[in-house]
């Protein structure tokens, strides 16, 4: 998901997506440890998506404080 798409969502929706992506990341890491993961690049994609979403949330917090 791109940053522009994330900015169109509400903060609550973003937080919900972060929660679901964290669960997915946990499952991917578990699959990696047990040797069942085929697409290892997915871990990196999920981590970057979480970071993008947290960045947008933080931008909104900073804008609200000004």
UniProtKB/Swiss-Prot annotation:
An annotated GO BP: translation
Disulfide cross-links: none
UniProt keywords, alphabetically: Ribonucleoprotein, Ribosomal protein
Coiled coil residues, start to end: none
Domain of life, source organism: Bacteria
Entry similarity comment: Belongs to the universal ribosomal protein uL29 family.
UniProt protein name: Large ribosomal subunit protein uL29
